[in-house]
From Swiss-Prot:
Tissue: Retina-specific (at protein level). In the light-adapted retina, expressed in the outer segment of cone photoreceptors. In the dark-adapted retina, strongly expressed in the outer plexiform layer in the region of contact between the cone pedicles and second order neurons with little or no expression in the cone photoreceptor outer segments.
SMART domains, alphabetized: CLa, CLb
Key words, A-Z: Coiled coil, Disulfide bond, Glycoprotein, Secreted, Signal
Residues bearing attached sugar chains per UniProt: 196, 257, 285, 311, 351, 412, 430
Recorded family membership: Belongs to the clusterin family.
PANTHER family: CLUSTERIN, CLUSTERIN-LIKE PROTEIN 1
Keyword hit for Signal: yes
Lineage: Eukaryota, Metazoa, Chordata, Craniata, Vertebrata
InterPro entries with a match to the protein in the record: Clusterin-like, Clusterin_C, Clusterin_N
Organism: Canis lupus familiaris
Principal location listed in the UniProt entry: secreted
Protein's recorded name: Clusterin-like protein 1
Top-level taxon of the source organism: Eukaryota
């Protein structure tokens, strides 16, 4: 016997003793098991596919609910935008009217201002040495006094102009709304497409399902199946504060009884200030000229014209003789105080409408994020079944196992660690599973184990939308 033939014979005997290669009986048993696996697997795969189809049905129903909520939010957002634009339009109209009235007021007040200044000048003539060192500076002081009084009476807050919504703000908000709408619409299309693919799978396997399930899946009835819903993440998610109702009240009724009045508040302040000056202790003018120069207005009444208190306190105690100085604004410009009040009200209206719009916009954004999160979780759990629609119809079996051979680990010829099985669901391409030794064909849960691994394979390789 040649040495090479001897070595080959010894090698075959060694393989037989080690059971590293399957015997003819083993191969026959494996082939029989494959047929049994396919038949038993059809039953289990049927249930898994049914669960996934129910999940896809619930995904469709939930998306339809979310779509209706999104539509209501967008309608509310549109209404808020219209209210905000109307408030801004009103604000601009009132402000424009105020500017016109103030311009006319400046012209009509020229004579009144001259009368007031003349009255003060004549009554303060005897005190001009104490009021100011020179008469020219006295006139300048009186003119400055009137300018400050007018600014104090009608202070239009320049900062409010910065707070008003500008064109860039509207453009930014419109772009954000358009993006939300586009993302939600795309999500709706994706969910419908995924469900339609699942519907194709249902039609391929329709004869495998009972009549109750067929009726449910093809109907629009919202039949919740909590046992089949996905186990979504239990991590808490932040929710936007819900509004009381989608109905937005008319903003133009909020300030119907608005009682702010600049005229009354400022008029009261001026009256108190002048009365405080008038109540100063009367001094002997001939003997107390020096002391008069040291008189000052009370600190709390200096206001915007407190700088005139030191030397003009005695001059202004004659304001009763110059009532024109106190009433000229109300007589010649009666609409200006009211218009300032309306401007403040309109500005407040703009701010409230802007805040309301921002609140609804934030709710819409949160609603989109929550919907996307929920649909993604359901897609991850059930979407794999839609991938079966890519396979050609007409497969005889739902679940096929085409080949099962022992696997020998490299470098370890002493034992069989796992079995290699080629599987397919419907007409999907074959994929290979490695079955560990403890999950052998003789164990009762072998089919369940293979099916679980097959479903995991589909989920892992499921294409994202």
């Amino acid at each position: 016997m040649k040495p090479s033939l001897l070595v080959f014979t010894v090698y075959l005997l060694w393989l037989k003793d080690c059971h590293c290669a399957p015997t003819w009986k083993d191969k026959t048993d494996m082939h029989g098991n494959l047929k049994g696996f396919s038949e038993a697997g059809d039953i289990d795969v049927d249930e898994e596919v049914k669960k996934a189809l129910i999940g896809m049905k619930q995904m469709k129903i939930m998306m339809e609910r979310r779509e209706e909520e999104h539509t209501n939010l967008m309608k509310t957002l549109k209404k808020c935008k219209e209210e905000k634009q109307e408030a801004l339009k009103l604000m601009n109209e009132v402000q424009e009217h105020l500017e016109e009235e103030e311009s006319l007021c400046q012209v009509s007040l020229t004579d009144s201002w001259d009368e007031c200044k003349s009255c003060l000048e004549s009554n303060c003539m005897r005190f001009h040495t104490t009021c100011q060192p020179s008469w020219s500076s006295m006139k300048n002081t009186v003119e400055q006094f009137f300018r400050n009084i007018y600014q104090y009476l009608f202070p239009f807050d320049e900062d409010n102009e910065k707070d008003l919504p500008v064109g860039e703000k509207f453009i930014e908000e419109d772009a954000q709304v358009a993006q939300i709408e586009n993302v939600f619409n795309q999500l709706t299309v994706d969910v419908r497409f995924l469900f339609n693919r699942s519907l194709n799978v249902f039609k391929q396997m329709q004869q495998e399902f009972d009549q109750t399930f067929q009726s449910y899946f093809m109907s629009d009835t919202d039949l919740m199946q909590p046992n089949f819903l996905p186990a979504l993440s239990k991590e808490p998610r932040k929710k936007a504060d819900p509004v009381q109702s989608w109905d937005i009240p008319s903003f133009f009724q909020l300030f119907y009884n608005f009682s702010l009045s600049i005229y009354h508040s400022i008029s009261t302040t001026i009256t108190k200030t002048l009365n405080a000056i008038e109540d100063l202790p009367k001094q002997d003018n001939d003997s107390n000229h020096g002391s008069l120069s040291s008189k000052t207005l009370p600190v709390q009444h200096r206001g915007p014209y407190g700088e005139f208190g030191q030397n003009l306190s005695e001059c202004f105690q004659f304001h009763a003789r110059c009532q024109k100085c106190q009433d000229y604004l109300w007589e010649d410009c009666p609409d200006v105080p009211e218009l300032h009040t309306k401007v403040d009200e309109a500005l407040e209206l703009v701010n409230i409408s802007h805040q309301q719009y921002a609140q609804v916009l934030q709710m819409t954004q949160h609603h989109l994020e929550d919907t996307t999160y929920l649909m993604e979780k359901m897609r991850e759990e059930f979407g794999w079944v839609a991938d079966l629609a890519n396979q050609a119809p007409g497969a005889e079996n739902i679940f096929d196992s085409t080949k099962m051979v022992p696997n020998i680990h490299e470098g370890n010829f002493s034992k069989q660690d796992e079995t290699m099985i080629d599987l397919s669901i419907l007409s999907s391409p074959n994929f290979t599973l490695k079955i560990p030794l403890e999950e052998s064909a003789e164990t009762s849960n072998f089919i369940s184990y293979m099916l679980e691994k097959a479903v995991q394979h589909f989920k892992k390789h499921f294409k994202t939308w």
